[in-house]
């Protein structure tokens, strides 16, 4: 599958003929080499015998080895240009962006596709205690506990079994499952992995990415 982009220089450009046959790949072209704005979107439909051609026990790239061989042998190799939603989530910023796009319905994915604005999605097995504040759009998964005074703000994603302690704030952050956000802590546009522990009055600011099992002690600023 191909998709058009404004700037193909960061991607693999794909040239096709008028019938959709792929004629050339050009990885990260220079501006003067651009002949089309269609790039490789990374989605393929392969015949079963493709896997018989993949050598065993060696490093091998389907894009760099198999696809060029199809062109050289003039085998059937067709492209479909998708003009719908597509995003490269290879950076933390784009990873955050795709969640926001889903919540804003730029991409019609469940559960937000069928929700009325402001479409906060809260699993029936989550527990939002009295005095907590939820502002949509946001996503709160099963088993989440949000304690009094805590706030889950717009574009936040809170994974399964997370605990958000009293007066903590999650604003536009993505928090994977089984993490605990301590009292008075604040997360702003950050990404946290699984099983993280954020201590009391910790501040985690925009652009921060914490891996699985990260722990920040009380009053830390990152």
Identify the residue ranges that each predicted region occupies:
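Catalytic-core segments of class I nucleotidyltransferases/pyrophosphorylases
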Residues: 6-8, 18-113
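Glycine-rich hexapeptide-repeat left-handed beta-helix
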Residues: 163-222
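Nucleotide phosphate-binding site architecture
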Residues: 51-52, 135, 153, 205
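Glycine-rich phosphate-binding loop of ATP-grasp-fold ATP-dependent ligases
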Residues: 9-13
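A short, conserved acidic/glycine-rich loop-to-beta-strand motif
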Residues: 1-4
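Glycine/small-residue-rich pyrophosphate-binding loop that anchors the diphosphate of NDP-sugar donors
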Residues: 40-43, 58, 118, 136, ...
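Extended, small-residue-rich solenoid/repeat segments and analogous flexible loops
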Residues: 72-165, 169
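Short, ordered coil/turn segments that flank beta-strands lining enzyme active or ligand-binding pockets
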Residues: 18, 124, 142, 160, ...
């Amino acid at each position: 599958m191909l998709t058009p982009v404004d700037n193909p220089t960061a991607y693999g450009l794909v040239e096709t003929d008028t019938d959709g046959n792929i004629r050339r790949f050009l990885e990260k072209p220079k501006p003067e080499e651009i002949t089309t704005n269609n790039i490789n979107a990374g989605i393929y439909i392969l015949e079963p015998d493709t896997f018989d051609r993949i050598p065993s026990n060696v490093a091998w790239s389907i894009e760099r080895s198999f696809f060029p061989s199809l062109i050289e042998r003039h085998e059937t190799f067709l492209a479909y240009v998708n003009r719908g939603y597509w995003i490269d989530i290879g950076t933390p910023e784009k990873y955050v962006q795709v969640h926001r796009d889903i919540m804003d319905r730029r991409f019609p994915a469940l559960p937000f596709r069928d929700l009325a604005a402001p479409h906060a999605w809260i699993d029936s097995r989550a527990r939002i205690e009295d005095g907590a504040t939820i502002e949509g759009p946001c996503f709160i998964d099963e088993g989440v506990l949000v304690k009094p005074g805590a706030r889950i703000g717009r574009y936040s994603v809170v994974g399964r079994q997370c605990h958000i302690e009293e007066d903590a704030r999650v604003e536009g952050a993505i928090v994977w499952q089984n993490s605990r956000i301590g009292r008075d802590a604040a997360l702003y546009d950050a990404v946290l992995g699984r099983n993280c522990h954020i201590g009391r009055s910790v501040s985690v600011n925009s652009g921060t990415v914490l891996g699985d099992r990260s722990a920040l002690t009380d009053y830390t600023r990152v």
